[in-house]
Amino acid sequence: MNLNKILKLIPKTDLHCHLDGSLRPETILDIAYKENIPLPNKELANFQEEIKVIGKCTSLKEYLNKFNLPIQIMQKEEHIYRVTLELLEDALKQNIKYIEIRFAPFNHLKDGLTLDQVINTVLTAMNYGRTHLNIMSNLILCILRQEPVEKGIELVNTAKKYVGKGVVAVDLAGNESDFPPEIHEEAFTLARKYGLHRTVHAGETGLPENIIKSINILGAERIGHGTYAYKDKEIITCLKENRIPLEVCITSNVNTSAVTSYQEHPIKKYLDEDLIITVNTDNTTVSNTNLIEEFNYLIKYQSFRFDDIKKVIKNGIESSFASKEDINKLYEEYLSAINVIELTNPIL
């Protein structure tokens, strides 16, 4: 059995996947035509340069510009439903059995939709995926760092209505360099009060202190990226002692120049130091990747062995914000697949 077949056989999770960064290019093109949205390039091959990063950007800010067009076409319920369902279909092709989709609802109100309409549309598609496609999913709502504090509070108050109905957490995303975590403390305090989980993008772009702030001030239960944790031993100790998982997205970190190369990424060092590491896509379209590709990069550039792969996939199940019932189901499927693989590939 070759490596890709082995990776495909194992049921996986993706805990860090942005909806607006994971649209099919042909869908963006199709909706743009229907909505008369002007395009810089109308041929699919050339157009993809507008929404994908091939290689590196000079910064996270440049990387985030790739989201402009996808957000522009996600302003109607039918389009939001379509791209959500397509993301679930694409995840299934990677044998992802549980995915936490995240996005910022405030980005999708330009044509008159309400927060409730946007959130309900995504949840409706996700419910269809669970019942008809056999893929489990939950929704994480992103507060944008650069937005007024009041918007974050409004989003959390809206999210409260969907606790137990598919919305499991809030996230803090966006320009980390200019907007530190503590700005949005009130929103995260409310989220905890309402029973919402908390994950925060932190330490992605060279500010390791944001990791500690996110944990201590915002009550983060997971950290998105955490790439620069190695800069401070105190942070490594904090992550280890508090058993805070990192949502690692290796290709994205190369794209944003958070790391210079796949080889230089600290993921294997973190894993060897017994941090809880999960492997995720971040943005399948913008980063031009998928989950199996991420594992292939880890094998090629980080010398991941089969035991490492098993460990991070198991971490993904255990670190998820899924219900206990869903976690147990995922774990049973994972163990079953691992048993088959190890019986048929004893040299692994």
From Swiss-Prot:
Q: Which residues bind Zn(2+)?
A: 16, 18, 201, 282
Q: Does the keyword Hydrolase apply?
A: yes
Binding positions (substrate):
18, 20, 174
Transmembrane portions of the chain: none
Q: Which GO terms describe its biological process?
A: adenosine catabolic process; hypoxanthine salvage; inosine biosynthetic process; nucleotide metabolic process; purine ribonucleoside monophosphate biosynthetic process
Q: Does the keyword Aminoacyl-tRNA synthetase apply?
A: no
Keywords assigned: Hydrolase, Metal-binding, Nucleotide metabolism, Zinc
Q: Which domain of life is it from?
A: Bacteria
Which metal ions or organic cofactors does this protein require, according to UniProt? Zn(2+)
Which EC number(s) does UniProt give? 3.5.4.4
**Which terms does the record give in the GO molecular function aspect?**
2'-deoxyadenosine deaminase activity; adenosine deaminase activity; zinc ion binding
Which Gene Ontology cellular-component terms appear in the entry?
cytosol
Reactions this protein catalyses: adenosine + H2O + H(+) = inosine + NH4(+); 2'-deoxyadenosine + H2O + H(+) = 2'-deoxyinosine + NH4(+)
Q: Where is this site: Important for catalytic activity?
A: 225
Q: How is the cofactor bound?
A: Binds 1 zinc ion per subunit.
Q: Where is the active site?
A: 204
Q: Would you identify the family this protein belongs to, as annotated?
A: Belongs to the metallo-dependent hydrolases superfamily. Adenosine and AMP deaminases family. Adenosine deaminase subfamily.
Q: Which NCBIfam families match?
A: aden_deam
List, alphabetically, the HAMAP family matched.
Answer: A_deaminase (MF_00540)
What role does it play?
Answer: Catalyzes the hydrolytic deamination of adenosine and 2-deoxyadenosine.
What is the protein name stated in its UniProt record? Adenosine deaminase
Lineage summary: Bacteria, Bacillati, Bacillota, Clostridia, Eubacteriales
**Gene name, please?**
add
